[in-house]
Amino acid sequence: MANYTKRMRDLREDRDINQGAIAKVLHTTQSQYSKYELGKRSLPIEHLITLCKLYDVSADYMLGFTDEPKRLPKK
């Protein structure tokens, strides 16, 4: 099972997005977001949902329960 903080960083870096840009989407600071990626602070569920939507991946993938990104179903 992969560490969700590594998945957060990998997904962000794969898309060439900096921490500040993600922090704005989450309505937080770059410093706070950095703490989420480093595992120094727990990621709120609201932020998890937002990141899954942003990256178009399932929560199972983000949390490391699966290695298949499983795109979210379109409504």
Residue ranges of predicted features:
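Conserved amphipathic alpha-helical interaction elements at protein-protein interfaces in regulatory
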Residues: D10, D14, T28, L54-V57, ...
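Hydrophobic side chains within well-formed alpha-helices
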Residues: Y4, M8, S58-A59
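Conserved hydrophobic/aromatic packing and binding residues within compact polymer-binding modules
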Residues: M8, I22-A23, Y33-Y36, M62
